[in-house]
Amino acid sequence: MVVMARVPRPERPDLVFEEEDLPYEEEIMRNQFSVKCWLRYIEFKQGAPKPRLNQLYERALKLLPCSYKLWYRYLKARRAQVKHRCVTDPAYEDVNNCHERAFVFMHKMPRLWLDYCQFLMDQGRVTHTRRTFDRALRALPITQHSRIWPLYLRFLRSHPLPETAVRGYRRFLKLSPESAEEYIEYLKSSDRLDEAAQRLATVVNDERFVSKAGKSNYQLWHELCDLISQNPDKVQSLNVDAIIRGGLTRFTDQLGKLWCSLADYYIRSGHFEKARDVYEEAIRTVMTVRDFTQVFDSYAQFEESMIAAKMETASELGREEEDDVDLELRLARFEQLISRRPLLLNSVLLRQNPHHVHEWHKRVALHQGRPREIINTYTEAVQTVDPFKATGKPHTLWVAFAKFYEDNGQLDDARVILEKATKVNFKQVDDLASVWCQCGELELRHENYDEALKLLRKATALPARRAEYFDGSEPVQNRVYKSLKVWSMLADLEESLGTFQSTKAVYDRILDLRIATPQIVINYAMFLEEHKYFEESFKAYERGISLFKWPNVSDIWSTYLTKFISRYGGRKLERARDLFEQALDGCPPKYAKTLYLLYAQLEEEWGLARHAMAVYDRATRAVEPAQQYDMFNIYIKRAAEIYGVTHTRGIYQKAIEVLSDEHAREMCLRFADMECKLGEIDRARAIYSFCSQICDPRTTGAFWQTWKDFEVRHGNEDTIREMLRIRRSVQATYNTQVNFMASQMLKVSGSATGTVSDLAPGQSGMDDMKLLEQRAEQLAAEAERDQPPRAQSKIFFVRSDASREELAELAQQANPEEIQLGEDEDEDEMDLEPNEVRLEQQSVPAAVFGSLKED
C-alpha cells in the first residue's frame, strides 16, 4: 500500500512513502540529526528509483549540510547516474551544480575536489576544469596541495596548450622545486628548448639539487651540453661557449665529450672555422689518450664531411676554379691532420708525464729527416725532464743529442752537449758515469786516444769534497769518483794505451777505493801475470780476498789456488797448504767440494798419500749432504788406487753410517760385492744382514734378490733359512710401522668403513673404538697375507706297507715350506760326510795391492 503525503510548500516535490519506509521515517523523525539513521535509510533505498534516492539524499543534506559522508555518497551516486550519458546532456549540469552546492560546506575536503576535477576532465570542459583546479588550490591549505597537483599536471599535459601548461608548471615548481626534471622534459616535448636549457642550467648550478631519476650532476650537465649544442638556433638566452668551457674545468674526466659538444655547437651554427679552432685547441689540451681519440675522430669526421659537402655542391652547381682551390685546400688540410696524428698523440702522453724519457725518444723518431725539429725536440727534452722525476734514464737524452751532432759531423757541438751533461745533477751516479763513458767513447771513435784518457782521468779524479757513493744528499759530481763503470773503462784504456805503471796504479786505486768486483781482481792478477809479476799477482789475489766474503770470494780463491799450484807445484808445499787451509776456513759447504778436490790433488801429486786421504776424509764431512755420496765415491776410488781395496773397508763403513738410506743401501751392495771378490763370504753375509734392516721387502726387491743370489752361490740351507727369517722379521717391522701410522691417520680422518659423524649421537664413544679395531684387524690380516704361511704340525697315519713314493708325498704335505734344492746341490751334499767342510781355493785380486801413482 502506498501512502501519499503532500507537502504544503509548492516548491517542494511530493514525498511518496511505501509501507516498508515507515519504520525508517519514524526513526528519522525521532533522530533527524543522526547521520547513522539517514545512512541506514539510504542503504535500504539503494534499489529505489534514482529520483526517489536523490530526494532522500537532499532531505538528509538539508538537515545535515556539513556531513562529509552524506555529501561524498551523494556526489558519487550522482556521478554514477550520468556516467553513460553524453556529456552534452543537461543532467551533467545538474551534477556540476550539485558539486558546487557541496563546496559551500565541503570546500576543505580534497577528495571531493579531486573527484569533481576528474569529473570535469571527463566532460572535456578545459577552462571550467582549470578554474576549478585553481579554486581547489585556493580553498585547500598548502599542506594538501600535493594531492591536487598530480591530477592538475596530468590535465595540463593532456591538452595541447603549452602556455597554460608552462604557467601551471611554474606555479607547481614553487611548491616542489625538486620536480624540475619533469618540467624540463615537458618543455623539450613541447619544443620550448630555450626555457628548458635555462631550467637545466639552473638545476646543474644548484649543488643542493637531488635528481628524482637518480641522475648525477655530470649526467645533467651532459644533457645540457647536448641540448644547447644540438639546438643552437633555438637556444638564444644562454652563452653556450661559456657554459661548456665551465664544464671543461669542472668535469676533467670527460673532456673529450665536452670538447666535441662545443665543436658540434659551432658546426650546427654554421661557424665552421670556429669549430676547427675548437678542435685544434682540444687536441692540444686533452690529457688522456681516450679523450684525444674521441676528439681526433670527431675532427677527422668533420673534415671528411666538409670535403664531401664541397664535392657534392660542386657536382650540382658546376665546378669553378675557385671551388677547385678550396677543395684542394680542404684535402691538404685533411691529409696534414692525418699525418700529424702520431705527433699529437705523443704530445698527449708527454702532457701526462713530461719526464717520460722514452716518449721523448719516440718524439725525436717522429721528426726523422727534419734536423731543426730534432734539435728543438732534444733541447726541449733536456730542459723539461727533471732527473729526480724522470721515468727511464735521463742521461740517454743527452747522449742521443750528442750522437745526433756526431752523426752529422759536428764534433764540437757534440762535445759541448756532453760537457753540459757532466754538470747535470742526475739522481743516480750511474747516469753521470754513463755520460763520462760516452765522452770517452766519442773520442775513441774518432781516434783521439789521449783525449779519451784525459777525460776519464778527469772523471775519476778526487773531488775537493769527498762523499760516500750512496750519500743522496751530495751531488753526483762529488760521488762519481767511486763509480766502477768509469774505473773499468779507464783500466781497459790504460791496458790498451797506457804503460804498465799507469795501469797498475789504476787497479791499485780501484782496490784502495774498495769498489772492485771479483772479476776486476782476477783481471788485475792476470794482467800482472802476463807481465811476469807473479808475486805481485798473488798479492792482488790476497787483496781481493780481503775485500770479499763467501760466496763472492769463491772465484778468486779457485783462480788463486789454481795459478799458485801451476806456478810453484810442490816447491812451496807448506805455503800452498796454508792457502788451502785459509780458503777452507769459513767456506760454506756448497763451495767446499771444489776446494777439497783441488787440495787432495795437490797432496796426491806433491805431498803425502795419508795427507790426501785425510783431505778426502774431511771433505766427506764438510760438503753438503747432497754431495756426500759423490765425495765418498771419489774417496773410495782414490783409496783403492793408492792403498788397495782392503783400505776401503773403513770408508765403506763410515759412508753407510753417514749417508741416507738410499745411498747407504747402494754402498752396502758395493761393499758386499767387494768382500765377495776378496773371498770374505762371512763378511759379505754380515753386510747383507746389516743392510736388510733398511730394506723394505715391498719396495726394495732388488736387494733381496741380490742377497738370495748370493746365498744360492755361496750359502747353504741354513743360511737361506736365516735370510728368509730376517726378511720376515724386517717385513713384520715395516708392517707394524704401517699399522701404527694407519691407526694415527684413522683417528684424524676416519676409516673406509665409516666415520664417527655417521653414527648415532649416543654411540660415538663406543663405535669410535669399534672402527679402530676393525681397521687394525684389516691391516693385520693384510700383513699376515704378505708373510709366508707357517708350517702346521699335522698327525698322519702311515701304513706299514706304504711305498717310498707315498712316503715322499706325505713328507711333502707335512712340510710344504721345505726348501727344494737343485739336483746338483743334492748330489754334492750326498758326497760329503756329515763332518766334512768343502774348501775352495781362490786367487787374491790384484786390486788388493795398491800403490802410489808413478811420476
From Swiss-Prot:
UniProt keywords, alphabetically: Acetylation, DNA damage, DNA repair, mRNA processing, mRNA splicing, Nucleus, Phosphoprotein, Repeat, Spliceosome, Transcription
Membrane-spanning residues? none
UniProt keyword Calcium present: no
The GO cellular component terms are: catalytic step 2 spliceosome; nucleoplasm; nucleus; post-mRNA release spliceosomal complex; Prp19 complex; U2-type catalytic step 2 spliceosome
Q: Where is the composition biased (Acidic residues)?
A: 820-834
Q: Which SMART domains match?
A: HAT, TPR
Pfam families with a match to the protein in the record: HAT_Syf1_CNRKL1_C, HAT_Syf1_CNRKL1_N, HAT_Syf1_M
> Where, per the database record, does this protein carry N6-acetyllysine?
K420
> InterPro entries under this entry?
HAT, HAT_Syf1-like_N, HAT_Syf1_central, HAT_Syf1_CNRKL1_C, Syf1-like, TPR-like_helical_dom_sf, TPR_rpt
One GO BP annotation is: generation of catalytic spliceosome for first transesterification step
Ranges for region Disordered = 808-855
HAT repeat segments run 15-47, 48-80, 90-122, 124-158, 160-192, 198-230, 235-268, 270-305, 369-407, 498-530, 532-566, 571-605, 643-677, 679-713
Q: Where does the record say this protein resides?
A: Nucleus
- Which positions carry Phosphoserine? S851
Summary of subunit composition and partner proteins: Associates with RNA polymerase II, the TCR-specific proteins CKN1/CSA and ERCC6/CSB, and XPA. Identified in the spliceosome C complex. Component of the XAB2 complex, a multimeric protein complex composed of XAB2, PRPF19, AQR, ZNF830, ISY1, and PPIE. Identified in a pentameric intron-binding (IB) complex composed of AQR, XAB2, ISY1, ZNF830 and PPIE that is incorporated into the spliceosome as a preassembled complex. The IB complex does not contain PRPF19.
Family label: Belongs to the crooked-neck family.
What is the documented function of this protein? Involved in pre-mRNA splicing as component of the spliceosome. Involved in transcription-coupled repair (TCR), transcription and pre-mRNA splicing.
Q: Which PANTHER family does this entry report, sorted A to Z?
A: PRE-MRNA SPLICING FACTOR, PRE-MRNA-SPLICING FACTOR SYF1
This protein's name:
Pre-mRNA-splicing factor SYF1
Provenance organism: Rattus norvegicus
